[in-house]
């Protein structure tokens, strides 16, 4: 996976640069890149894009025909480049890196909050306010429920994880007692 991320990075950076230069703006490009990634992740599309009977022009034409949003010329050129370099199937990874670049540019980050119980909007806002101070970023929360945590929350922001769940505390206690 690390190798694919390394291969995808220059494409994500180039796409991000093009999006910053485009008057349509980052938000519309982020939506478009998300749609491109969804289409590229589809199993039938992946199979079609590896069909040896199709040449590069046909692959690009088939792929662009599956996109519902209007494609600016820069996006068409990007798709052509990916097809020529046999990198079209990296679009989901490129999209993830694009979102990371966009978030870094905007000074924001995705906060994946996993809770044992459903959190009210007020609880999420209070938690996000405290986490924004801790991480120094504007956070976009994504809340999921996992009853196996027993209680508490686990928060992932980028590669940092803050786990205050009862399950994690019990695991630490077990490890301490076993040592």
Curated annotation (Swiss-Prot):
Protein known as: ATP synthase subunit delta
Protein family per UniProt: Belongs to the ATPase delta chain family.
HAMAP family in UniProt: ATP_synth_delta_bact
MF-aspect GO terms: proton-transporting ATP synthase activity, rotational mechanism
NCBIfam families: ATP_synt_delta (TIGR01145), PRK05758.2-2 (NF004402)
Bilayer topology annotation: Peripheral membrane protein
GO cellular component terms, semicolon-separated: plasma membrane; proton-transporting ATP synthase complex
PANTHER family assigned to the protein according to its UniProt record, in alphabetical order: ATP SYNTHASE DELTA CHAIN
Organism superkingdom: Bacteria
Function according to Swiss-Prot or TrEMBL: F(1)F(0) ATP synthase produces ATP from ADP in the presence of a proton or sodium gradient. F-type ATPases consist of two structural domains, F(1) containing the extramembraneous catalytic core and F(0) containing the membrane proton channel, linked together by a central stalk and a peripheral stalk. During catalysis, ATP synthesis in the catalytic domain of F(1) is coupled via a rotary mechanism of the central stalk subunits to proton translocation.
Keywords from the UniProt entry: ATP synthesis, Cell inner membrane, Cell membrane, CF(1), Hydrogen ion transport, Ion transport, Membrane, Transport
Subunit structure: F-type ATPases have 2 components, F(1) - the catalytic core - and F(0) - the membrane proton channel. F(1) has five subunits: alpha(3), beta(3), gamma(1), delta(1), epsilon(1). F(0) has three main subunits: a(1), b(2) and c(10-14). The alpha and beta chains form an alternating ring which encloses part of the gamma chain. F(1) is attached to F(0) by a central stalk formed by the gamma and epsilon chains, while a peripheral stalk is formed by the delta and b chains.
Record localization: Cell inner membrane
Pfam families in alphabetical order: OSCP
Xref: InterPro entries: ATP_synth_OSCP/delta_N_sf, ATPase_OSCP/dsu
């Amino acid at each position: 996976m690390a190798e694919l991320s390394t291969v995808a990075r220059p494409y994500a950076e180039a796409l991000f640069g093009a999006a910053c230069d485009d008057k349509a703006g980052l938000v519309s490009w982020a939506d478009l890149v998300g749609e491109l990634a969804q289409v590229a992740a589809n199993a039938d599309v992946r199979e079609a894009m590896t069909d040896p009977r199709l040449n590069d022009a046909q692959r690009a034409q088939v792929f662009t025909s599956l996109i519902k949003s209007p494609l600016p010329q820069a996006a068409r050129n990007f798709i052509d480049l990916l097809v020529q370099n046999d990198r079209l199937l990296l679009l989901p990874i490129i999209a993830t890196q694009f979102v990371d670049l966009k978030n870094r540019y905007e000074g924001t980050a995705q906060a994946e909050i996993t809770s044992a119980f459903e959190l009210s909007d007020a609880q999420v806002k209070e938690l996000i306010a405290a986490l924004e101070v801790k991480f120094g970023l504007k956070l976009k929360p994504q809340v999921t429920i996992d009853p196996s945590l027993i209680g508490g929350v686990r928060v992932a922001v980028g590669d940092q994880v803050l786990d205050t769940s009862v399950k994690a505390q019990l695991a630490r206690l077990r490890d301490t007692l076993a040592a």
